[in-house]
Regions:
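Short beta-strand/loop motif that positions the catalytic acidic residue
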Residues: 179, 185-187
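Active-site loop/oxyanion-hole signature of alpha/beta-hydrolase fold enzymes
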Residues: 54-95
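Conserved HGGG/HGGXW glycine-rich cap/lid loop of the alpha/beta-hydrolase fold
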Residues: 14-63
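Flexible "cap/lid" loop of the alpha/beta hydrolase fold
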Residues: 102-110, 116-144
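Catalytic histidine neighborhood in serine/cysteine hydrolases
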Residues: 205-219
């Protein structure tokens, strides 16, 4: 299908890049930390048959810039609500991976009326929800890029991304209880997010379903897209989000 590319200007002058294709109700795809919308290259060809798919480069990622000296999830959530307004949408379904899932959760708490359904692939609201070695690696990267940014200015942007992984999202357990839309928590058997935390999310969100795929890791959608895509479509079909 025909794909269109756009830049959406935010009130602070930041330009958010996104690609749009397909027909049907809107589906936002939100990538993980340090990545871009290209992560979903194996999802778009199928999903665009059922949805108008918006593949978004989050602020400071991919082709999107950031005019602010900081980066956090509420700021990124505000970008999404601006994009929704500019596209004249009322509400959207969101599929988020890793930090994209965290962003989807923050967005759902801040703008609950804008969310039809959620697919949360390997998200975590607390840093403690990620396995120790992954947090250790993020901390090591933080030190490396902090030292490097004195000599290479562009490392400052990388620092802001890494800090996202080393701070809690700001979503509380009580706020999870208030998420009213149908939600799928989907993770790999060998995920970076602990099983305990993923089950906690599924238990805390009233209309949540939980899928844990054997043989898969944090990058399930990229490693085994056919399986991942069918799980997502089956869920969205079950809650009435897939157009016949």
């Amino acid at each position: 299908m025909k794909k269109e590319a756009f830049y959406s200007q935010m009130p602070d002058g930041t330009e958010i890049y996104y690609e749009k294709s397909g027909v049907g109700e809107p589906l936002f795809l939100l990538h993980g930390n340090g990545d871009s919308g290209g992560y979903f290259s194996h999802q778009v060809p199928l999903f665009e048959k059922y949805f108008t798919v918006y593949v978004i480069d989050s602020r400071a990622h991919g082709k999107s810039n950031n005019t602010q000296p900081y980066l956090d999830f509420p700021l990124m959530a505000d970008d999404l609500v601006q994009l929704i307004a500019q596209e004249s949408l009322s509400d959207v379904t969101i599929l988020g991976f890793s930090d994209g899932a965290n962003l989807a959760l923050v967005f759902s708490v801040l703008y609950p009326q804008k969310v039809r359904a959620l697919v949360l692939n390997s998200g975590n609201i607390f840093v403690s929800g990620v396995k120790f070695w992954a947090n250790w690696w993020s901390s090591a990267q933080l030190i490396w890029f902090w030292l490097g940014h004195f000599f290479i200015p562009k490392y400052q942007q990388k620092l802001s991304m890494i800090r996202l992984m080393l701070h809690d999202s700001g979503v509380s357990e009580s706020q999870l209880h208030q998420i009213a839309c149908p939600t799928l928590i989907i993770v790999g058997y060998r995920d970076l997010v602990t099983l305990r935390h993923s089950k906690f999310l599924a238990r805390s969100i009233p209309q949540a379903s939980f899928v844990r795929m054997k043989g898969e890791n944090h990058f399930y959608a990229r490693r085994n897209p056919d399986s991942f895509n069918q799980e997502v479509l089956a869920f969205l079909n079950s809650v009435g989000e897939v157009e016949k």
